[in-house]
């Protein structure tokens, strides 16, 4: 064989062998450098990365000082699963089953009967007044410390009815990565949820890295009093504030006092929050998670009992909001799925 041809073949083999060795390590290195590794390369991921780069680049017209970098996130259906029902509703159902043993007279009410008997048809058509009554019975007439313990004990043992995993494992890996990425870029991350503020506060820091003072949600009535000479906050019957739809911008103003520049939601209950955030001066970004993955999660939007998304889909384009397509955009949904 011609010596030059032989040398060329040797070089080709060496290069190919070197490529086989380096490819896995290069892929690993690239993945390690990717701040959102569970996101597929898509318009959604690109929009997030470009926006963050835009507002954090010093010396540019769109630079936003760290103290103004505020991002708000809905919780149910945006950060964790809301199917087959809101997690707080599952908490209410379990609480009712315990309460009726102590107070059998509660079974005189149809909503309580339906919970104990498992009448899903009735439960899917609960009136707002019945839901309020269930929340009051299961959340009120105790101190905030007592309620915190009840929530912590429940969240530590309760399991998702479909995945049979703790609810705290049923969080969306890509969204947790996003929270971490934003905080690394000096954003302050807030939860703005229609769920109960005191239901979320006991566990969100350990799951999302969001401290309790950065949680905004619906609130029940409370009162300060001395119990056995100990200063105590008591939970009372009655709803004080509903942090849903038009209540979300109000909650943001009450708790934060600044208009956020980033907003993430998944349902029509988040419409006004995204509308408020993206109407701000300067660069803003609003995004909606659309549940399109029937294999890894649940596909739903316009017809869902929980997390209905219809108006947001219709208006997203004209409002300039991005749609995050779960099936298309996420490489991984839950931590227990690979």
PLM region descriptions:
Residues 1-13:
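Bacterial N-terminal signal peptides that target proteins for export
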Residues 10-25:
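Bacterial N-terminal signal peptides
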Residues 29-39, 43-49, 53, 68, ...:
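C-terminal cap/substrate-recognition subdomain and adjoining C-terminal extension
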Residues 51-70, 83-84:
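N-terminal carbohydrate-binding/catalytic regions of secreted carbohydrate-active enzymes
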Residues 69-84, 274:
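Asp-based phosphoryl-transfer active-site loop
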Residues 80-82, 122, 202, 213:
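Secretory-pathway/luminal and periplasmic proteins that interact with or process carbohydrate-rich
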Residues 82-85, 90-93, 202-203, 276:
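Short, solvent-exposed loop/turn and secondary-structure capping segments
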Residues 85, 90-169, 173:
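A metal-dependent, Asp-based hydrolase signature
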């Amino acid at each position: 064989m011609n010596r030059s041809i032989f040398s060329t073949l040797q070089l080709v083999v060496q290069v190919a062998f070197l490529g086989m060795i380096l490819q896995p390590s290069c892929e690993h290195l690239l993945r390690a450098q990717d701040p959102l590794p569970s996101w597929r390369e898509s318009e959604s991921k690109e929009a997030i990365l470009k926006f963050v780069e835009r507002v954090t680049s010093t010396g540019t017209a769109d630079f936003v000082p760290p103290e103004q970098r505020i991002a708000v996130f809905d919780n149910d259906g945006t950060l964790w699963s809301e199917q087959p029902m809101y997690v707080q509703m599952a908490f209410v159902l379990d609480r009712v089953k315990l309460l009726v043993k102590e107070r059998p007279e509660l079974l005189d009410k149809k909503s309580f009967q339906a919970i104990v008997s498992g009448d899903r048809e009735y439960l899917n058509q609960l009136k707002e007044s019945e839901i309020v009554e269930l929340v009051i019975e299961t959340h009120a007439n105790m101190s905030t410390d007592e309620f915190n313990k009840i929530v912590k004990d429940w969240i530590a043992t309760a399991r998702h009815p479909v995945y049979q995993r703790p609810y705290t494992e049923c969080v969306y890996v890509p969204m947790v990565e996003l929270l971490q990425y934003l905080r690394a870029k000096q954003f302050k991350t807030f939860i703005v949820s229609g769920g109960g503020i005191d239901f979320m506060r006991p566990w969100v820091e350990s799951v999302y890295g969001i401290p309790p003072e950065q949680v905004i949600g619906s609130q029940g009535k409370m009162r300060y009093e001395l119990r056995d000479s100990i200063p105590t906050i008591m939970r009372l019957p009655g709803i004080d504030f509903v942090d849903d739809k038009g209540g979300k911008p109000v909650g943001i103003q009450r708790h934060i006092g600044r208009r956020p520049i980033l907003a993430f939601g998944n349902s029509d209950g988040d419409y006004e929050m995204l509308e408020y955030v993206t109407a701000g001066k300067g660069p803003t970004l609003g995004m909606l998670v659309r549940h399109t993955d029937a294999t890894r999660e649940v596909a739903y939007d316009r017809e869902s009992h929980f997390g209905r998304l219809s108006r947001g889909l219709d208006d997203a384009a004209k409002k300039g909001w991005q749609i995050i397509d779960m099936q298309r955009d996420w490489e991984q949904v839950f931590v227990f799925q690979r």
